[in-house]
Amino acid sequence: MLVLFSCASVKEPQGGPLDSDPPKLKSTTPAILTNLNQGQKITLSFNEFIKEESLKNAIELFPTVNQKIDFEYYGKEVIITLPSNLDDDKTYVISLNSNLSDEQNVKLNDNIIIPISLSNSINQAAIKGKIFGLYSKPSILLWKGIIDKSELPSRKPDYIISSNDKFSFGFLAYDKYTVLAVDLYNPKLSLEKNKLSFFSENFIELTKDNTPDLNFFFNAEEVEVELDSLNVTEDIEQFANIVGNINGNYILPVVVELRNEDNSFKTELSFDGKFKIDNVNSGTYQLFAYQDRNNNKILNTGNLQDDSNSEKFYVYPDSLILRANWELEIEDWEIN
C-alpha cells in the first residue's frame, strides 16, 4: 500500500557518497493507466527525493492540450492531476523531461515516458532514429497528419521528443505524421528562427508493420577559413586515403564525405559507383553519402521557404579509423 505524506519541508539526506545517478521512476498509482477518468490524480513514486523547483518545466503531456497539468510535491512522490478536456479515444503520454532533477541537481539523461488512456487500450505505433552532424540539444517535433510547410510555424506540435544522438518514441496512433528536427528548440521563438533539419520525405506513415528509422543531419554554421599557403605543403606520408564502391538505388550526383568534429573530406561518386578520398588526416571518422540535388557539395537539410526537404543521405554503419600512410577499402556499401 502506498502511503502519501506531507511535511513542512523536505530535506535531502546528509552525508554519504556524492550522488551522480539521475532519479528513477519506481511505480505509478494506479499501476494500470488505462480506463482513467477526466481530472484523475496519478501518483508518481521515485527512488529518491525530487527537487521541487525542477518540476515546473519538467512535466509535459502529449498530444498537447490547452489545459495545464497540475501537480503536488511530496518529496519522493509527485501527484499529478490530469486535465479535464482529454479525448476518450486518444492515447496520451506524460513526459518527464531533462529538466527533472533530484535534490543533488542530477538531471534525467533520457525522458521518462508514461502512456495513459481514458479507453481500455494504448496505441502501439513507434518511431526511432539518429541525429548526425553538429548540434547541441536536438528535439524531434511531430504533427499528426500531412501539414503544409507554410502552416507549421502557426501550428503547435502534437509531440516534442527530446533527443541526443538517437531517439525513440512509442505509443503513437497508426497514422501519417509530419516530422521535423530542431536544435535547441525554443517554442517562444517563431519556428523559422530555430535551427531546423527536415526529413527527406514530406511525411511518414506509421503502420503495424512499419517502424520508420529516421535520420536527421545538422550542418555547422558557415565559417570561411583563409588558408596560409606557407603551411599547406605537408609530407604525403602523414596522410591516409580511403577507396570503395557503392551499390544500390541512387541518382547521381552523389557526394561521398568522410567527416569528424575537426575535418571533412569530400569526393563525387563515379559513374561505376567507385570513390576515392586522398590526403586524409589520421583519426576516427563517419562516412556519409548523399544525393547532391543542387550540385553545391553540401548536404542541404531543407527550409521553410520552399518545398525542398533534406537531401537523402546514408551513413556507413561503422565508424572508421584511418592511420597515416595507410589505405582503407570499403567494399560493396549497399544503399537504398
Predicted segments with their positions:
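Primarily interfacial, aromatic-capped hydrophobic alpha-helices that serve as membrane anchors
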Residues: 241, 326-336
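A short, Gly/Thr-enriched small/hydrophobic beta-strand-prone motif that recurs across taxa
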Residues: 120-134, 222-250
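Sec-dependent bacterial lipoprotein signal peptides
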Residues: 1-7
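Structured interaction patches on ligand/partner-binding surfaces of diverse proteins
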Residues: 110-111, 185-224, 293-330
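Short, contiguous acidic/charged loop-to-helix segments that flank catalytic cores in large enzymes
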Residues: 232-234, 247, 265-278
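Acidic, low-complexity Ser/Thr/Gly/Pro-rich repeat segments typical of extracellular/periplasmic
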Residues: 7-180, 193-199, 257-271
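Short Pro-Gly-centered beta-turn/loop motif in secreted/extracellular proteins
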Residues: 163-186, 272-294
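Calcium-regulated, polybasic anionic-phospholipid
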Residues: 252-255
